[in-house]
């Protein structure tokens, strides 16, 4: 672990404020990239503090923008900070920070959705999964447009222990729209409980740490922002392939106002739907009249375990997609109507 019980002694030299840099570079937030800048360094410092002790740690910051959180990370006396920024307009401002912190800041122009962070840091940082988390952290003020696909991608990486998690149980401290943050951390039975809740919590200890009011950002978003901390679990609560778990969970939550059996039926072709759904629920010992927000992680584990056995018995079952079946049926009906019209 990074050294503890020791105050950071390294600090950035005096620099223009983030607001001054934005004016200097004549940069405006790009709406198409869902950009919102956090200029208050008291808040960026708080995000970094909540990430844990970063002294001598290696940090991967996603979407640094004008560099507010970047400054706070550097002031935490990290060993190295890697930033990946898609928008080239921010590179000069980040380069100014790099010049002020020689050897500490590495800037990559790229897309966080495709960047291979598993090759970014030294092999010596890797730790066995069962050990304490490595001295590698992910921190970021995520653009709203990429936050959900990115966390799903990283959750799959956790399941496979690849990507940023080749180093071990890499911790993440990330921002989301408040509503998404609440869903990620929602307890069983709460109104916020969702697909994201289950997918995140079967793999991680998830904490919604604090909320930042929208007025703290420039431009001000229409929503508040939640800061969420993730620590991957040593043992996932569901030990099945990620895609299988995702399919079961998605089906349960696709009809939020119905009983859970309504969504689970869509796992099976129409000809065997009722029988197979009944068998799945009976073997998993799950009440078919639970609402989607009510099943616990252990319920989902049972459903996934039984569904896996059913897929093993019928190798074509996992590939089944009820929307494709509907599409084919609609196409056949249209062809029949055309034939009838011709006759």
UniProtKB/Swiss-Prot annotation:
Its EC number is 2.1.1.-. InterPro entries: KsgA/Erm (IPR001737), rRNA_Ade_diMease-like_C (IPR023165), rRNA_Ade_Mease_Trfase_CS (IPR020596), rRNA_Ade_methylase_Trfase_N (IPR020598), rRNA_adenine_dimethylase (IPR011530), SAM-dependent_MTases_sf (IPR029063). GO terms for biological process: rRNA methylation; transcription initiation at mitochondrial promoter. It catalyses: adenosine(N)/adenosine(N+1) in rRNA + 4 S-adenosyl-L-methionine = N(6)-dimethyladenosine(N)/N(6)-dimethyladenosine(N+1) in rRNA + 4 S-adenosyl-L-homocysteine + 4 H(+). It is found in: Mitochondrion. SUPFAM superfamilies: S-adenosyl-L-methionine-dependent methyltransferases. Its main location: mitochondrion. Pfam families: RrnaAD. It is an enzyme of class 2 (transferase). Residues 1-27 form a transit peptide. S-adenosyl-L-methionine binds at residues 38, 63, 85-86, 111-112, 141. S-adenosyl-L-methionine-dependent methyltransferase which specifically dimethylates mitochondrial 12S rRNA at the conserved stem loop. Also required for basal transcription of mitochondrial DNA, probably via its interaction with POLRMT and TFAM. Stimulates transcription independently of the methyltransferase activity. Mitochondrial methyltransferase which uses S-adenosyl methionine to dimethylate two highly conserved adjacent adenosine residues (A1583 and A1584) within the loop of helix 45 at the 3-prime end of 12S rRNA, thereby regulating the assembly or stability of the small subunit of the mitochondrial ribosome. Also required for basal transcription of mitochondrial DNA, probably via its interaction with POLRMT and TFAM. Stimulates transcription independently of the methyltransferase activity. Interacts with mitochondrial RNA polymerase POLRMT. Interacts with TFAM. Bound to the maturing mtSSU until the late stages of assembly. NCBIfam families: ksgA. Belongs to the class I-like SAM-binding methyltransferase superfamily. rRNA adenine N(6)-methyltransferase family. KsgA subfamily. This is Dimethyladenosine transferase 1, mitochondrial. It comes from Pongo abelii. The lineage of its organism: Eukaryota, Metazoa, Chordata, Craniata, Vertebrata. The gene is TFB1M.
């Amino acid at each position: 672990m990074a050294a503890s019980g020791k105050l950071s002694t390294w600090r950035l030299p005096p620099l223009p404020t983030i607001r001054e840099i934005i004016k200097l570079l004549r940069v405006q937030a790009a709406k198409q990239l869902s950009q919102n800048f956090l200029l208050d360094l008291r808040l960026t410092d708080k995000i970094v503090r909540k990430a844990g002790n970063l002294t001598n740690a290696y940090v991967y910051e996603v979407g640094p923008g004008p560099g507010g959180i970047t400054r706070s990370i550097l002031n935490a006396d990290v060993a190295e900070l890697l930033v990946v920024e898609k928008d080239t307009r921010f590179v000069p401002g980040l380069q100014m920070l790099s010049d002020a912190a020689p050897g500490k800041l590495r800037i990559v122009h790229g897309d966080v959705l495709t960047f291979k962070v598993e090759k970014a840091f030294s092999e010596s940082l890797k730790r066995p999964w069962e050990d304490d988390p490595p001295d590698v952290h992910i921190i970021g003020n995520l653009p709203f447009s990429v936050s959900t696909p990115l966390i799903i991608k990283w959750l799959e990486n956790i399941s496979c222990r690849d990507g940023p998690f080749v180093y071990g149980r890499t911790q993440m401290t990330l921002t989301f729209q408040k509503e998404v943050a609440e869903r990620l951390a929602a307890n069983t039975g709460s109104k916020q409980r969702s697909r994201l809740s289950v997918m995140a919590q079967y793999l991680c200890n998830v904490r919604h740490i604090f909320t930042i009011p929208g007025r703290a950002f420039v431009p001000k978003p229409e929503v508040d922002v939640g800061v969420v901390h993730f620590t991957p679990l040593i043992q996932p609560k569901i030990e099945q392939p990620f895609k299988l778990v995702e399919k079961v969970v998605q089906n349960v939550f696709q009809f939020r106002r119905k009983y859970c059996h309504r969504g689970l039926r869509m796992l099976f072709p129409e000809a065997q739907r009722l029988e197979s759904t009944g068998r799945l629920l009976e073997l998993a010992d799950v009440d078919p009249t639970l609402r989607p927000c009510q099943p616990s992680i252990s319920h989902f584990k049972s459903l996934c375990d039984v569904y896996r056995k059913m897929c093993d018995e019928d190798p074509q079952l996992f590939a089944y997609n009820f929307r494709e079946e509907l599409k084919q049926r609609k196409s056949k009906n249209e062809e029949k109507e055309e034939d009838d019209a011709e006759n």
